[in-house]
Amino acid sequence: MKKKLLFLGPPGAGKGTQANLFCKKYGLIHLSTGDLLRDEVSSGSVLGIKAAEIMNKGELVSDELVLSIVEGRLANINEGWLLDGFPRNVNQANSLKNLLEKINQPLEGVILIKVADDYLIKRLVERGRQDDNEQVITNRLKIYREKTSPLIDLYKKQGILEEIEGNADIDVVFSCIEKSLG
């Protein structure tokens, strides 16, 4: 079983849910940049306030900020890990690759969870987070298509991408992920 993983997919695809299940079952450390950023916002720090302003508009937090958060976490992990919500663009992917080479922890697998837009919007609106209103969601999906979708080709070319249909029940999606990482 691969132990250094990345889950990709649009907002609301179920990356966090699947990552939590996978990490719990296989003892990996779950690194969710969304959770790390929300924790920073909740702390009320200057950085958290700045991040909240960006996130509430549905925009992406700067590469430098997210990379420094991820680097701080990865530096303290010797066992397996699963990244969820990072990288979000080719620049971040290249920075992540350099970081992982530096700490001798190369990425072993990437799971792309694919979900139809209408299903995503419904799922996100029902989730009820402050940054989950329809206008913000539509903007987040647009940014995902523009910035994050190119990662699919990047990881395909590296031979480490597995695509999973995410419209099914949680258990079905989880089973598909397990089989693909076998």
UniProtKB/Swiss-Prot annotation:
Main location: cytoplasm
The UniProt record lists the keyword Membrane: no
Region entry NMP, spans: 32-61
EC id: 2.7.4.3
Keyword Transferase: yes
Reaction equations catalysed: AMP + ATP = 2 ADP
Places the protein is found: Cytoplasm
Alphabetical GO biological process terms: AMP salvage
Cellular component, GO, one term: cytoplasm
Entries under CDD domains matching the protein: ADK
Associated pathway: Purine metabolism; AMP biosynthesis via salvage pathway; AMP from ADP: step 1/1
UniProt-annotated binding residues for ATP: G12, A13, G14, K15, G16, T17, R127, A168
Entry note about domains: Consists of three domains, a large central CORE domain and two small peripheral domains, NMPbind and LID, which undergo movements during catalysis. The LID domain closes over the site of phosphoryl transfer upon ATP binding. Assembling and dissambling the active center during each catalytic cycle provides an effective means to prevent ATP hydrolysis.
Function field: Catalyzes the reversible transfer of the terminal phosphate group between ATP and AMP. Plays an important role in cellular energy homeostasis and in adenine nucleotide metabolism.
PANTHER family for the chain: NUCLEOTIDE KINASE (PTHR23359)
Family affiliation: Belongs to the adenylate kinase family.
Subunit structure: Monomer.
Protein name: Adenylate kinase
Protein's gene: adk
